[in-house]
Amino acid sequence: MKALILVGGYGTRLRPLTLSVPKPLVDFCNKPILLHQVEALVKAGVTHVILAVSYMSDMLEKEMKEQEKRLGIRISMSHEKEPLGTAGPLALARELLTENSEPFFVLNSDVICDFPFEDMVRFHKHHGKEGTIVVTKVEEPSKYGVVVYETESGQIQRFVEKPQVFVSNKINSGLYIFSPAVLDRIQLRPTSIEKEIFPAMAQEGQLYAMELQGFWMDIGQPKDFLTGMCMYLQSVRQKHPEWLHAGPGFIGNVLVDPTAKIGQNCSIGPNVTIGPGVTVEDGVRIKRCTVMKGSRLHSHSWLESSIVGWSSSVGQWVRMENVTVLGEDVIVNDELYLNGANVLPHKCISESVPEPRIIM
């Protein structure tokens, strides 16, 4: 089977991290976002992954060529010369997608969830129509476009954009499986699959919804990235508790790379990921944070709901909170307070940031 992953966006909502790497290569729980998706696809029997690329495509190509060998699959690049929306990339990759007549997966690159790829194949083959959308239940459907479908069969009746009165609490999760016939509906131009292709398919009875059972999060912005991290760690707790770090000073779900060094008298967790080569000095307190490869947290620093980008340094007695995000190679001097700061790569912070703002 094949899968097309839409990785062409600029990732502006996840800046400053996406100023250093394209969004699919940002580390999520110690592994690039894209790799979580690709490994789940491979596990479900996918042998050919096509990446619809544009922004920083060289970096993506280099990283994924290394993974291609490790995973024993074929990875192809489909280069967009102009942004093609969410449907145009399917037309661009048409030749690759129609090398055989099997159905194929399509994924948005921001999605982290309990990927239900095997179930999707079974469900899609059972109804035998052109398309299947995975839907997920949300608390506040008014913020999204919702999907209205027959609960028994899953046949989609209509879509309602940001409803003000309750019609459904199921939304499009950004995971699809299509039969090749769907490609006859899509032209090679900027096109929205959600607004231009899906409504026509639903009207013709060719589109079905399958409900996701596990967790789901669109991690395209820092606040949601951290929420998604908490959900992912809880899922790890249920499925692979042996991956999590335990011992004195560790609280709840904590993922620590084996190459990280942790000092004495630290309090780490709940919901923390610590990447490769990270050094955490004595007396550090971390909760609900991700600390990326090669960073250093100096003694007695205190971090909550923050993201520390690659190779950054947080000084002694620093306090960081409220979705503070440090880009790559940021230095925060000793004894400062950062509240909701968004710090661009290669900056040195020498004064406190008491109110949320971007540090250029």
From Swiss-Prot:
Q: State one Pfam family annotation.
A: NTP_transferase
Output one GO MF annotation.
Answer: mannose-1-phosphate guanylyltransferase (GTP) activity
SUPFAM superfamilies registered for this protein in UniProt: Nucleotide-diphospho-sugar transferases (SSF53448)
Which reactions appear under catalytic activity for this entry?
alpha-D-mannose 1-phosphate + GTP + H(+) = GDP-alpha-D-mannose + diphosphate
Which CDD domains does the record associate with it?
M1P_guanylylT_B_like_N (cd06425)
Question: Keyword annotations for this protein?
Answer: GTP-binding, Nucleotide-binding, Nucleotidyltransferase, Transferase
EC numbers: 2.7.7.13
Per the record, the similarity remark reads:
Belongs to the transferase hexapeptide repeat family.
Name of this protein:
Mannose-1-phosphate guanyltransferase beta-A
Task: Give the organism the record lists.
Answer: Xenopus laevis (African clawed frog)
